[in-house]
From Swiss-Prot:
InterPro entries: FluC (IPR003691). The keyword Cell inner membrane applies. The lineage of its organism: Bacteria, Pseudomonadati, Pseudomonadota, Betaproteobacteria, Burkholderiales. GO terms for cellular component: plasma membrane. Belongs to the fluoride channel Fluc/FEX (TC 1.A.43) family. Pfam families: CRCB. PANTHER family: FLUORIDE EXPORT PROTEIN 1-RELATED. This is Fluoride-specific ion channel FluC. It is found in: Cell inner membrane.
Length: 126
């Protein structure tokens, strides 16, 4: 990867992280047991990765820096497995097993579902 790839990943990651932080600031306090901002970031990221995979698979001639910017950078910064894991662990430690299970299913199942919906949307529109 050349210097432009590093710049693309860095810019994308910064923008994705800022969006994730903004969603957390706006919505996490509404339900600390299932922080909606983190969930929104992961579901949105899942949907957008589906769109991006569909787009980049049908546009193989694009410079690789665009994929690095969008997928590795932006979506890597937006989605947050480490935050998701710490929130699930907090539920488990406090004995909130039902919330922990809902948290796990919402993020994992929801992200997979939204990724499939994103790919389906792209294929429908392409």
């Amino acid at each position: 990867m050349g210097p432009l790839g590093f710049v693309a990943v860095g810019i994308g990651a910064a923008v994705g992280a800022w969006l994730r932080w903004g969603l957390s600031v706006m919505w996490n306090a509404l339900n600390p047991a299932l922080p909606y901002g983190t969930l929104a970031a992961n579901l949105l990221g899942g949907y957008l990765i589906g769109l991006a995979v569909g787009f980049f698979d049908t546009h193989p001639g694009l410079p690789p820096e665009w994929r690095l910017l969008a997928i590795t950078g932006f979506l890597g910064g937006l989605t947050t497995f480490s935050t998701f894991s710490s929130e699930a662990l907090a539920n488990l430690i406090s004995g909130d097993y039902g919330w922990a299970l809902l948290h796990l299913l919402s993020h994992l199942g929801g992200s997979l579902l939204f990724a499939a919906l994103g790919l389906w949307t792209y294929r429908l529109l392409a």
